[in-house]
């Protein structure tokens, strides 16, 4: 027969409630170290394992937090996941991670699965404009925090990078080098980050400059959009600097430039966004905007814990994180020729 919490308490010589507090990550700090050690030793000797369903009935919480991310292979999300998990673990919660496809029904299915696990809260890195998963989360009264993407909906606090500041830093750097003609390869416009960076680009570069929607935050999308832009004008390309929606788009753009007979940075300066791992090891090393993704995960966890512990209180304020521009080898002074004619 499996050991119970009462068995652990009897062996340790403490009240059952004290044993429960000592074995919970969220409350163990409230128990004296010597008492906690006795309880933990007793639990180990008896082979005690907490029963999740019983704990839920006792506390009204499952101890689980759901986190939805669009692409686990994207290195942007690893630091967010790691820091959010570490922070929540210290507060007594375990993260359940779901990777969701862009299709609406797949996203809803993933959220339904988390709801059946009775998650106490959600961290969403997948939010889009008019996203049905937010409607479902609200219908089930699940405390929810948006990470990396914000929608301006006061019901859902967000922890995001200051994308306007990202573009200010980027354009200021390129103008300091002497660039006057810019191209923006934006992310998808149904993404809040894609739109925020596009708006920041227009604000600091001006609305007269060329914008091409990459359609996705991938290397292939960057390649296809840059290649199409280079080939669409028979007389050649007048832009000298390419501002990209993220680092993967930038890598695709560099590939397309090289394939067309161009060079980075001699023919085009290219700037990425996010400073994902290994951008210092590509050739040329990528000038990019560093987003503090580890801090983003930590802050999102803190905001969510605040929401879960006081669900009826005022919604916490969203948090805007300041980026940094990392200068590397993919930017230089503009080429001397006014027009770049691609190899076809």
Go through each PLM region and give its residues.
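Flexible loop/turn connectors
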Residues: 231-344
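Hinge/beta->alpha junction and helix N-cap segments in small-molecule ligand-binding domains
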Residues: 52, 70-79, 97-106, 158-169, ...
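N-terminal helix-turn-helix DNA-binding module of bacterial transcription factors
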Residues: 1-61
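Short helix-capping segments at alpha-helix termini
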Residues: 90-91, 140, 204-210, 233-237, ...
């Amino acid at each position: 027969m499996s050991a119970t919490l009462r068995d652990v308490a009897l062996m340790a010589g403490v009240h059952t409630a004290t044993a429960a507090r000592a074995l919970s990550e969220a409350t163990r700090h409230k128990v004296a170290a010597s008492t906690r050690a006795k309880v933990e030793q007793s639990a180990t000797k008896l082979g005690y394992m907490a029963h999740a369903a019983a704990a839920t009935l006792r506390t009204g919480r499952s101890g689980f937090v759901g986190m939805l991310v669009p692409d686990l292979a994207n290195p942007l999300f690893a630091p967010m996941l790691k820091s959010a998990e570490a922070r929540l673990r210290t507060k007594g919660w375990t993260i359940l991670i779901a990777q969701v496809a862009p299709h609406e029904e797949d996203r809803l299915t993933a959220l339904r699965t988390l709801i059946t696990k009775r998650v106490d809260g959600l961290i969403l890195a997948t939010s889009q404009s008019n996203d049905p998963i937010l409607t479902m989360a609200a219908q089930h009264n699940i405390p929810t925090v948006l990470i990396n993407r914000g929608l301006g909906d006061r019901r859902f606090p967000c922890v995001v990078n200051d994308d306007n500041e990202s573009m200010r830093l980027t354009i200021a750097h390129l103008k300091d080098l002497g660039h006057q003609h810019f191209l923006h390869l934006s992310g998808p416009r149904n993404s809040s980050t894609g739109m925020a960076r596009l708006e920041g680009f227009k604000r600091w570069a001006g609305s007269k400059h060329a914008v091409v929607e990459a359609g996705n935050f991938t290397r292939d999308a960057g390649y296809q959009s840059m290649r199409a832009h280079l080939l669409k004008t028979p007389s050649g390309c007048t832009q000298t600097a390419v501002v990209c929606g993220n680092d993967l788009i930038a890598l695709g753009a560099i590939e397309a430039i090289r394939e067309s007979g161009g060079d980075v940075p001699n023919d085009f300066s290219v700037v990425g966004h996010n400073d994902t791992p290994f951008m210092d090891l590509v050739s040329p090393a990528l000038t990019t905007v560093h987003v503090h993704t580890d801090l983003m995960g930590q802050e999102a966890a803190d905001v969510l814990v605040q929401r879960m512990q006081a669900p009826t209180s005022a919604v916490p304020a969203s948090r805007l994180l300041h980026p940094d521009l990392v200068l590397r080898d993919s930017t230089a002074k503009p080429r001397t020729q006014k027009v770049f004619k691609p190899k076809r």
